[in-house]
Amino acid sequence: MKRKLLFLLLMLSSLTAKAEVKPISGTFINFFWQDERNNYMNQRNVDQSDPQRWACKIGELHERGVDILIIVTVANEGRAMYPCSFMEHGYPEGRKSPVDAIMDTADSLGMKVFIGCGWARDQLDDLTDPYVIETNRHFMDELAELYSRRPSFEGWYIPVEGCFIPYLSDYAVQGVNKISAHARELTPGIKVLISPYGLFGADIENPLFEKSICDLDVDIIAYQDEVGCVREQFPMKNMKEHFRQVGEIHKKAGIEFWANIETFTWDREANNWYSTLVPAAFGRVLSQLVGVNQAGVDKVVSFIVYSLFDKPGSPYPAGQRIYANDLYNDYMAWMNGDPRWKMLEEIFSGKDFGTHKVTAGPQALSDGKFGWEDPNDEAWCEFEGGKMECVIDLGSKKDISKVGAHFCDYYREGVIIPQCIEVEVSNDGRHFTKVKTVTYENWPNKYLDCWTDVILADELNARGRYVKITAISARGRILCSEVVVE
């Protein structure tokens, strides 16, 4: 009997651990303004070489739970951000370098740093170019001498992105392995990290896909999820399936399986050098987080936490005004167990909230099926005219602590999350008493994204058999997939 009880407790512990959603524990760091994409990440009017600024921002990242820093590149267009012997410095002589400022702060806080050994020229570096490979090695030689004995030095990041369409080419694998071999010779036991893209168009079931992964001489692959890049109109469902498939391959590959989730969206058209990266809605980011965790990733890092999430009141503000602070606040609220974000996390995780009879409105609003980030998903119920009404029959009088409604937002097709919901309770289904009205502030960076969110009325302390929900929107169509009553 005791053995059976112990087994059940172990199983419960295992299931609980499996359900835990790992937060974002790492961020990429980019020093250089390269084009319009970097307008908020690497502002041209801000001194990106200021060591005090970097010490402050790294400390703020540590406060929010980031313990892994990935320096994308140490040089760009002939300017180096460390004391390089063969390239002009990108910071004033006599001042501590940005790389040293980051390493010093990371040392003091127990953080880990991966250093990128580029750019030989610029962001268009090509691993088939002998000059690029040789310059990367030269960077690596100096960086190893300067930083490899630091407590925070965790390894190398090879910044030239490989593409998985349809799988990594032989020359991409060979280029990575040449740099990796030099890294292992210089710093035995130190890890090598890459962050390739292209899963949306990968031929994952092709044996050559698995072979290209297994042929890589790296320790960590942090796959770009490409949700921010919007490689597909509605990328979330496919992204989660692709990560699941790749996770199965990594069980055999002996390489750490990381996710690099893109927490940005665009202020104009995607994937060009003339649009600016801006913070995405946290509802979208949370769906990405849950998805890659369900695939079994070892860690979650992001391009990019620095500047897309920014601590309110920082002496060195970064990112898009107001909304970088708002994304930071939403993320920290989720980390601290905010009920709204907890319910949305549970929805993404597939929790069974049960079903009830709907006496007014579509029965699909309480059938246990939640809509994907796609307005064409069959789970969505559409309401026009700016108003949604439904009545849920709980079957008998019950205590009611919270009511949540799951909505879709897709600006390009006129789908807008309502401005508020009103919750009313009744014992007979005819006479209702209003118990709470909750307003919703929509996210402004919505030019491209489709995402879902919950409007939650909690701490109701109500009792009744019937629950009436009314949602109001001043414009656009309302799409709701489910109403949850607890």
PLM feature spans:
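Active-site groove signature of glycoside hydrolases
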Residues: 118-123, 140-170
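Disordered, acidic Ser/Thr/Pro-rich linker "stalks" and the adjacent N-terminal cap
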Residues: 337-397, 408-415, 437-447, 477, ...
